């Protein structure tokens, strides 16, 4: 009979790595966990590093475009390379892969722009735009973050998204200002809890939301949620166009 016992010498051994890379990874992990831009001191504490040590690593991470530093606030946030890596991960998700061909066909059929948005650190974030024949006179691009309150996309996330995730997004958006698509320089009074709940219940019942001439005058949109097999919100599909070119009727061709 053969002896199948594994000796200590035969056990898998941990591979050697580069410690400095792993320390830098702690800073990236801290940014991902906090889901908002962080100042040097807060980021260092979250990564369990001294501020001097964190600063040294952040210089290199910034050079690699894994993080970027806001010139005004001095806060650090994920950089362009992190965004590209994140997009690669998103593109492999079943819900995204299933929705992308539909978005492209829809843009071609209706002649309007179609955006796909996923949960991000600051809020719903555009990860893909399919452009139609009609020009879109609004500054939206991959990486644009949508307001949770003033955009159809944001309200769909409020209606169907994970509550803990939404709370983190809302906290991040509270001080984001014009970093958001849909930011209002003269904000409207927030609806009371009852009115907001009624609004979200109506969105859930319809399964679709719209915005008309808001937050950008002359631009309207219709948005639907996309779920995974377990019924969890994965992304939102939003048709956007000039108010003259888009039919925002609940029973119109786009809603259908």
What is each stretch, according to the model?
Residues 2-92, 96:
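N-terminal helix-turn-helix
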Residues 66, 126, 235-236:
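Short glycine-/small-residue motifs
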Residues 182, 186-256:
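Extended hydrophobic
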Residues 3-4, 135-215:
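Short, solvent-exposed recognition segments
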Residues 67-69, 116-117, 226:
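A structural signal for short hydrophobic beta-strand segments in well-ordered beta-sheet cores
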Residues 72-175:
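Amphipathic alpha-helical effector-binding/dimerization core
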Residues 17-21, 40, 75, 79, ...:
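Short, structured helix-loop boundary elements
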């Amino acid at each position: 009979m053969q002896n199948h016992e594994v000796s200590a010498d035969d056990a898998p051994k941990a591979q050697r790595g580069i410690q400095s890379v792993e320390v830098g990874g702690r800073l990236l992990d801290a940014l991902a966990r906090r889901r908002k831009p962080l100042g040097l001191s807060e980021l260092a504490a979250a990564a369990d590093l001294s501020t001097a040590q964190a600063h040294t690593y952040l210089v290199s991470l910034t050079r690699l475009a894994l993080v970027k530093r806001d010139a005004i606030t001095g806060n650090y946030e994920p950089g362009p390379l992190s965004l590209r890596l994140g997009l690669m991960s998103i593109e492999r998700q079943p819900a995204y892969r299933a929705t992308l061909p539909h978005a492209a066909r829809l843009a071609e059929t209706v002649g309007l722009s179609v955006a796909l948005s996923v949960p991000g650190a600051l809020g719903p974030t555009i990860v893909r735009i399919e452009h139609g024949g009609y020009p879109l006179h609004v500054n939206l691009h991959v990486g644009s973050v949508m307001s949770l309150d003033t955009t159809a996309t944001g309200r769909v996330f409020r209606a169907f998204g994970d509550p803990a995730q939404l709370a983190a997004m809302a906290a991040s958006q509270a001080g984001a200002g014009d970093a958001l698509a849909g930011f209002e320089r003269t904000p409207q009074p927030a609806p009371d809890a009852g009115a907001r709940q009624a609004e979200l219940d109506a969105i859930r019942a319809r399964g679709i939301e719209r915005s008309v001439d808001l937050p950008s005058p002359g631009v309207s949109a219709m948005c639907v949620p996309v779920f995974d097999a377990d019924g969890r919100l994965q992304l939102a599909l939003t048709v956007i166009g000039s108010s003259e070119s888009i039919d925002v009727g609940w029973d119109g061709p786009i809603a259908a």
